[in-house]
Design a protein with these regions (language model features):
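Extreme N-terminal tail/first-helix region
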Residues: 1-7
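Hydrophobic packing residues in well-ordered alpha-helices of helical domains and bundles
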Residues: 2, 32, 102-106, 144-147
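Generic recognition of short, well-ordered alpha-helical interface segments
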Residues: 4, 41-45, 97, 101-108, ...
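An N-terminal domain-cap segment
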Residues: 7-29
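Solvent-exposed, charged/polar functional surfaces in cytosolic regulatory/catalytic domains
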Residues: 8, 12, 112, 116, ...
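Short, contiguous alpha-helical
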Residues: 24-72, 118-175
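Acidic/histidine-rich alpha-helical segments that form the ligand environment
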Residues: 69-124
């Protein structure tokens, strides 16, 4: 699931010019590069959180729970949930990061996460929780699902930027 979200995200930003990566559709909207930077920054924090909660689970090991992970979604049928979500300041893009740099950082982080699979599968991750600023308390299973959901949410935002009438390269006069 995370791999699929990463592939969809990477496909949505591939082949863009620097002008397209840095196009801002409105003063209060992020560029494609800023969306990519945000994803890499958030996933860096989520990897640290995963390590922290995994260490807690391994300190008091219980076999994996036989339970369905409660649904958690930031999208409904591919549409963004209503309302604008504001990113905490710590994960707000600072700029100066290209899409390629953000994608490389994100792929490295996800590779580190994938290397934890055996350890994650060996313990019950439903006991360790952490509070999300907008979604409330989530267990580690839900946090892991959120990685892909979050990338998909920003992929949809990127597609919205690309569909803007002012997006560079869409008009024959710009070719």
């Amino acid at each position: 699931m995370i791999e699929n979200a990463q592939a969809r995200f990477a496909a949505s930003v591939s082949g863009l010019s620097e002008m397209q990566e840095n196009f801002r559709p409105a003063p209060d909207r992020w560029t494609i590069a800023e969306n990519a930077e945000h994803i890499a920054t958030v996933n860096s924090g989520l990897l640290r959180l995963t390590f922290k909660l995994l260490k807690q689970a391994e300190a008091d090991p219980k076999p994996p729970a036989d339970l369905a992970v409660p649904p958690i979604t930031m999208t409904e049928d591919g549409e963004l949930k209503p309302g604008k979500w504001s990113a905490p300041e710590a994960v707000t893009p600072q700029g100066g990061v290209t899409v390629a740099e953000a994608l490389a950082k994100n792929q490295s982080l996800l590779n580190d996460l994938f290397n934890l699979r055996e350890r994650l599968a060996a313990v019950d991750l439903s006991v360790q929780t952490w509070k999300h600023p907008a979604l409330g308390t989530l267990d580690l299973y839900q946090w892991l699902v959120l990685i892909g959901e979050h990338q998909d949410r920003h992929r949809i935002q990127i597609e919205t930027v690309k569909s803007s009438a002012e997006f560079p390269g869409l008009h024959p006069s710009e070719e």
